[in-house]
Amino acid sequence: MRRVLSLLVVLALIPAARADEFKLEEGFVRLDNGKDLAGWTGNLTGWSVKEGAIHLDVKMAKGNIYSETKHGGNVIIRLQFRAAPGADSGVFVHGNQLQVRDYPKAGPKQYAFAAKPAGEWNELEFDITNGTAEVKLNGQVIEKAWKIGSNAAQGIGLQKEAGDFDYRFIRIKEKK
């Protein structure tokens, strides 16, 4: 009986340990708080926070949302996303959009090599210098010299498109 009780206690602690796995890297500022949509603007209808992630319910959503956090033009942006099967969304950076989706099913196929299957978390990174971004998906370069301009005033946004989507651990670091 003691062994069973001990095992149940250990199993009960596993989800709590996973929730704490994320550690904010030095110099980064987190744009989502995992609790609500504070710090985000736009038409918030259909957007919510579920299980610590910004959730897009595409059937309810009316528009895109944008971070209210101001930043300079030379930055590193990191976030995690999870797409429902066939889902399509996007991340706006300085006014330009990178399609974020279930790449193996929805394309573009040239990104599929780096993507995890629908329903799994993917890590996306934008390293922006003087209006050009290198974009990595799960550590693999998917765009080497994406010209995005340097209009930091247009900020960071999340797109409403097709299928349910989750975003979490959205963070930014000013480059020196």
How should each PLM-predicted stretch be described?
Residues 4-13:
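Sec-dependent N-terminal signal peptides
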